């Protein structure tokens, strides 16, 4: 059975959920609590004493049961309270960095059973959730919103810079004057935007219903970013052949695996794309295959763009093709040929206009 991840568990504890309501009632009562979010034979094996309930979950019931010293065990889906006032007896040999008895039991139980375990400290009024070997302190919405709003401001600055370098790359593509450095600059900015977006997305998940406005802002700022990453990999990977889906995914995974320090190093980015890792190579000329440019043509499907790239090889060859040349490609009829030809002409004109403005 697949065990819940930390992200999934945090979403279950977000404002607007029944579990969060119960936790807030416990915090206000300052009684503390130990709650296991799942039940099977592994959980039963570490439970001692207490009593079976098997009643429907309700925040008020959780609050009342938490007044007792023992732990509360919920069903795996969280819909029922299975047991209450039980003593958790996990394997004491499991390593833990916690000092309090409740927190040590929670961490060990989470590791041993694979289910999330929540510990509520009555003295510090803090909720901590343990998932496997991970530990997460649940913050209040005001704290998360303050942090997320600062991150949104940073993301907006990153997005402005990304748009600038993307326009510069598009202009260089039309003029056939692209260097590897131009490409890596855009790749770097795309990745920076994606990473800070992930941080904010985690905050949005933790905010639950309190993060709706933040979700709208994030979606607007990140719209098309993942697609742009895929297109630039297809356009500029050093492979002499068109990338397969597996190769493209592997390249994106390599980008994901770069540390923040490596992301600032163009030689590390060049290596991911299959280019030499020398500084001199960054000023070498490269030619796009044309996926990015063709994606800018309204209503043009990827399948049609892929046909054109595989037939003509480079963007410059596509730009030089007439409507009849485009129509000669199997799968590209007269209507699409005219549409592509007009779209490329408009793209070139708008790019030149932007460079003059």
Curated annotation (Swiss-Prot):
**UniProt-listed GO biological process terms:** DNA repair
InterPro entries in UniProt: DisA (IPR050338), DisA/LigA_HHH (IPR041663), DisA_sf (IPR038331), DNA_integrity_DisA_N_sf (IPR036888), DNA_integrity_scan_DisA_link (IPR018906), DNA_integrity_scan_DisA_N (IPR003390), DNA_integrity_scanning_protein (IPR023763), RuvA_2-like (IPR010994)
A Pfam short name: HHH_2
Q: Which reaction does it catalyse?
A: 2 ATP = 3',3'-c-di-AMP + 2 diphosphate
Gene3D superfamilies recorded: 5' to 3' exonuclease, C-terminal subdomain (1.10.150.20), DNA integrity scanning linker region (1.20.1260.110), DNA integrity scanning protein, DisA, N-terminal domain (3.40.1700.10)
Q: Under which EC number(s) is this enzyme classified?
A: 2.7.7.85
The entry lists its GO molecular-function terms as: adenylate cyclase activity; ATP binding; diadenylate cyclase activity; DNA binding
State the UniProt keywords alphabetically.
Answer: ATP-binding, DNA damage, DNA repair, DNA-binding, Magnesium, Nucleotide-binding, Nucleotidyltransferase, Transferase
Q: Which residues bind ATP?
A: 70, 88, 101-105
For the protein in the UniProt heading, the enzyme class is transferase
Annotated SUPFAM superfamilies: RuvA domain 2-like, YojJ-like
Q: Which cofactor does it need?
A: Mg(2+)
Give residue ranges for domain DAC: 3-141
- Assembly and oligomerization: Homooctamer.
Described function = Participates in a DNA-damage check-point. DisA forms globular foci that rapidly scan along the chromosomes searching for lesions. Also has diadenylate cyclase activity, catalyzing the condensation of 2 ATP molecules into cyclic di-AMP (c-di-AMP). c-di-AMP likely acts as a signaling molecule that may couple DNA integrity with a cellular process.
Give the record's family classification.
Belongs to the DisA family.
Protein name stated in the entry = DNA integrity scanning protein DisA
Q: Which organism is it from?
A: Mycolicibacterium paratuberculosis (strain ATCC BAA-968 / K-10) (Mycobacterium paratuberculosis)
Q: What is the lineage of its organism?
A: Bacteria, Bacillati, Actinomycetota, Actinomycetes, Mycobacteriales
What's the gene?
Answer: disA
């Amino acid at each position: 059975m697949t065990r819940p991840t930390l992200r999934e568990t945090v979403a279950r504890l977000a404002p607007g959920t029944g579990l969060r309501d119960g936790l807030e009632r416990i915090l206000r009562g300052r009684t503390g609590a130990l709650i296991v979010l799942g039940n099977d034979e592994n959980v039963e094996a570490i439970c001692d004493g207490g009593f079976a309930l098997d009643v429907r979950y309700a925040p008020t019931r959780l609050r009342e049961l938490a007044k007792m010293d023992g732990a509360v065990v919920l069903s795996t889906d969280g819909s029922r309270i299975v047991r209450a006032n039980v003593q958790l007896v996990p394997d004491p040999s499991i390593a833990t960095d916690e000092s309090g008895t409740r927190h040590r039991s929670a961490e060990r139980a989470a590791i041993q059973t694979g289910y999330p375990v929540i510990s509520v400290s009555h003295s510090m009024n803090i909720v901590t959730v343990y998932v496997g070997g991970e530990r997460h302190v649940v913050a209040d919405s005001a704290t998360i919103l303050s942090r997320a709003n600062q991150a949104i401001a940073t993301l907006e600055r990153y997005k402005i810079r990304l748009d600038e370098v993307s326009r510069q790359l598009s202009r260089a593509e039309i003029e056939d004057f692209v260097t590897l450095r131009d490409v890596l600059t855009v790749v770097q900015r795309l990745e920076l935007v994606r990473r800070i977006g992930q941080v904010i997305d985690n905050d949005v998940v933790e905010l639950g219903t309190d993060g709706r406005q933040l979700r709208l802002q994030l979606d607007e700022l990140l719209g098309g970013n993942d697609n742009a990453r895929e297109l630039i990999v297809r356009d500029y990977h050093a492979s002499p052949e068109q990338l397969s889906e597996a190769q493209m995914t592997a390249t994106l995974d390599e980008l994901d695996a770069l540390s923040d320090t490596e992301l600032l190093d163009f030689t590390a980015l060049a290596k991911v794309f299959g280019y030499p890792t020398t500084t001199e190579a960054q000023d070498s000329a490269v030619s796009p295959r044309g996926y990015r440019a063709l994606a800018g043509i309204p209503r043009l499907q990827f399948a049609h763009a892929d046909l054109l790239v595989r037939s003509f090889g480079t963007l410059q060859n596509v730009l030089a093709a007439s409507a009849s040349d485009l129509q000669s490609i199997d799968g590209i009829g007269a209507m699409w040929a005219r549409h592509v030809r007009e779209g490329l002409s408009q793209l070139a004109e708008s790019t030149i206009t932007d460079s003059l403005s």
